[in-house]
Amino acid sequence: MKALFKEEAETRGIIVRVSASYLPEQSEPDRGRWFWAYHIRIENESPVTVQLLARHWVITDGRGGRHSVEGEGVVGEQPLIAPGGSFDYVSGCPLATPTGHMQGTYQMIAEDGSSFDVAIPKFALLAPAVIG
């Protein structure tokens, strides 16, 4: 399963795996718009159930411009993830440059009421012409 995902990070037994894909059909390079989809899997290898409450993304374009995005849950959900369970979702990111990267954190709450941040690994956003 790891082969599907290019990047991963682990915090307190919560593993976040990420893979990004360039979407040429939604991109308009001649208008300065490139678009990627990213697939995230959150796996709970801890002994307690956790709930994802919020997300915080830092998106950096190819010129070094940074944009911060915060919000409740992911794709309209605040999933509960039991020990041994996982949650997958797909979302997208536009940029005004053909390269960039994303990274961030998820705010989680454990069943005992304690909250903690889980790292989302840094992953590259690269348009194919830039790759090679």
Task: Give the residues covered by each predicted segment.
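Short acidic, flexible loop segments centered on an aromatic residue
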Residues: 48-67
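Short glycine/serine/proline-enriched coil/turn segments at secondary-structure junctions
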Residues: 27-28, 49, 96-100
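Short structured motifs
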Residues: 2-4, 22-26, 54, 72-77, ...
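Low-complexity, acidic Ser/Thr/Pro/Gly-rich terminal tails and inter-domain linkers that flank the onset
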Residues: 2-33
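Asparagine-centered strand-capping/turn motif at beta-strand->loop junctions
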Residues: 42-46
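Intrinsically disordered, low-complexity Pro/Gly/Ser/Thr-rich segments with frequent PxxP/GP/PP motifs
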Residues: 67-99
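Terminal connector regions
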Residues: 6, 94-132
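Hydrophobic core residues within well-ordered beta-strands of beta-rich domains
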Residues: 14, 34-36, 40, 53, ...
